[in-house]
Curated annotation (Swiss-Prot):
GO terms for biological process: ubiquinone biosynthetic process. Keywords: Cell inner membrane, Cell membrane, Magnesium, Membrane, Transferase, Transmembrane, Transmembrane helix, Ubiquinone biosynthesis. This is 4-hydroxybenzoate octaprenyltransferase. GO terms for molecular function: 4-hydroxybenzoate polyprenyltransferase activity. GO terms for cellular component: plasma membrane. Its main location: membrane. PANTHER family: 4-HYDROXYBENZOATE POLYPRENYLTRANSFERASE, MITOCHONDRIAL, PRENYLTRANSFERASES. The chain crosses the membrane at residues 22-42, 45-65, 90-110, 113-133, 142-162, 169-189, 212-232, 236-256, 265-285. Catalyzes the prenylation of para-hydroxybenzoate (PHB) with an all-trans polyprenyl group. Mediates the second step in the final reaction sequence of ubiquinone-8 (UQ-8) biosynthesis, which is the condensation of the polyisoprenoid side chain with PHB, generating the first membrane-bound Q intermediate 3-octaprenyl-4-hydroxybenzoate. It is a multi-pass membrane protein. Its EC number is 2.5.1.39. It is an enzyme of class 2 (transferase). The lineage of its organism: Bacteria, Pseudomonadati, Pseudomonadota, Gammaproteobacteria, Aeromonadales.
Amino acid sequence: MMSVIPAQWQPYWQLARLDKPIGTLLLLWPTLWALWLASAGVPSFSLLLIFTAGVFVMRSAGCVINDYADRKFDGYVKRTASRPLPAGRLTAVRALLFFLLLVLIAFVLVWQLNQFTIYLSVGGLLLAAIYPFMKRVTSLPQVVLGMAFSWAIPMAYGAVVGQLTVTTWLLFLANLVWTIAYDTMYAMVDRDDDLKIGVKSTAILFGQNDRLYIALLQLGTLTLLAIIGWLEQLTVSYYFSLLLAAGLFIYQQWLIRHRQRDACFRAFLNNNWVGMLIFAGIMLAC
């Protein structure tokens, strides 16, 4: 794919992670969960288009501001040393301008929605902007990331029904907990490097109890999603999707059993299938 991108645009492409769609997908699935549940299985095409485009744009913006914040650290981490900023292929000023451009595009998209959702979008922007800096001040940056990755859920409910329901916040919490679980796996990949440079994470905080805490978070995710199914009176196909998701969580636990970098990263990537399965269950159950 990179071979067809003009050389001068390749650093921007990589900065926005357009060559690595996993983050976009992990943000997209809960957004689709919310749109389908809020609209009783019949979301409007215009809302689908706006929110899907918004996911792509804001995920890219989040990656850009993350790399800007980490530009002085990424060169010391094996996985991130080749990124455009630490590698010197793009300046910090250009990265900031690119971030502002993406935020402007996101603002144009959200401006098509109702006033309540526009107000809610401010919270999402703030979370996306502050998350990268949380790794310096707290051992729980994954909580802030989870909030940022869940913020499209109240926005979806705001756009569809104009209010935030009990299901809205249960779904928000379920996705928050799930995000902490899978991003802890992601942080396990960099744990040794992060310890050397002073970057904090739940992987470091949990230490040798990391697998236990991830398992508890995964159990919490499934429990909250099951409660949502009961509240929304979803059919058995939804619960079957949760059962399959539980199977994937067990597989992820097996992958991370030795805490090897590649295996932890594979476990992280596997969460894409979790999100897709739950979405399929919601689609069939609504």
